[in-house]
Amino acid sequence: MKSAISKFGCAAFVIGAVALGVSTDANAQRKFTFGYDQPRSTAYGIAADIFDAKLKEVSGGKLSIDQFPGAQLGQEPVMLQKLRTGDIDFVITSTANASTVAPQAGVFSLHFIFRDQDHLAKTLADPQVSQAFREMIKESVQGAQVLGLITMGMRNMYAKKDIKSVEDVKGQKVRVQATKTEDTHFPAYGAQTVHMPFGEVYTSLQTGVVNVAENGVNVYLANKHYEVAPVLSMTEHEANNNCIWVSDKTWNSFSDEEKKWVQAAAEEVSRTEPMKALALEKESAERLKKLGVKVVEGVDKAGFIKAAQPIQDQLAKELGPHAEKILGLVRNIK
């Protein structure tokens, strides 16, 4: 009787384990939480899809992710905190938000350091740039590390009126990411900076708390900011760069082989996501035009650049040696 009960108990455990998706052998699948604060239809979703597909490929299906888009796990600063405590496995954040825990990450928020979109894509795929950024994060942040770099394209300004030159932002209240670089660049253009979580931007534009916001074209489209700020001016003042993070708790749970799989997936994202994200930006601009949004092209950038360029080296030096090194690497990429 005792033997029969034991056998029944073992069988029940196995059935329960299968029903719950619990591993009963070393080759079972493992799924990890992957959070980001933008809709699935943005470049964040593109990056997560590439990461998941490559991870499944190299691991033979043993490792994969569950995506939590649209700030389901919190806005980026909140997710970063949860990541560092091991409550989330993977997160995508902007490099600007990364600078809240690693100030030298603000180097990627410097204005007009990328000559064009091709230069941007080459930079993010460059192993030296990626390694320099990862070393900087490793030295500055406890509880998490960066696996790779991605982009959402270039940031542009949007408002209820045209921004055709630097004169048009003078005296305006501009919602910016809370970084030293933004708080230095925009006042140099004559604007007043305002900090707030991304989720508050729509209402703040609607009520006039801010007059201007800035972000990628697809982000502007996906979050329907055009409803309250129907003029998109293509200032392309800053790259909308981002990074893929992993919790140290999760990373340390991987075998050496699994770490290689995860890093390979991140490298695939850095190599292929930028061009897809840039293509998405162009598609989004066309969709916005059809929705009646006024897209101001041919912005006179000369005044912006004249104010921004002297600040680049000054800010990089103030941020620290890692920032100076990364800026030098960016400038040297042909």
Regions found by a protein language model. Give the residues of each.
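Coiled-coil-like amphipathic alpha-helices with heptad-repeat character
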Residues: K2, D25-A26, A98
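N-terminal secretory/targeting leader peptides
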Residues: Q29-L120, Q128, E135-K334
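Sec/Tat signal peptide C-region and signal peptidase I cleavage site
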Residues: L20-A28
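Bacterial N-terminal signal peptides that target proteins for export
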Residues: M1-A12
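Residue-level signal for alpha-helical transmembrane segments in multi-pass membrane proteins
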Residues: F13-L20
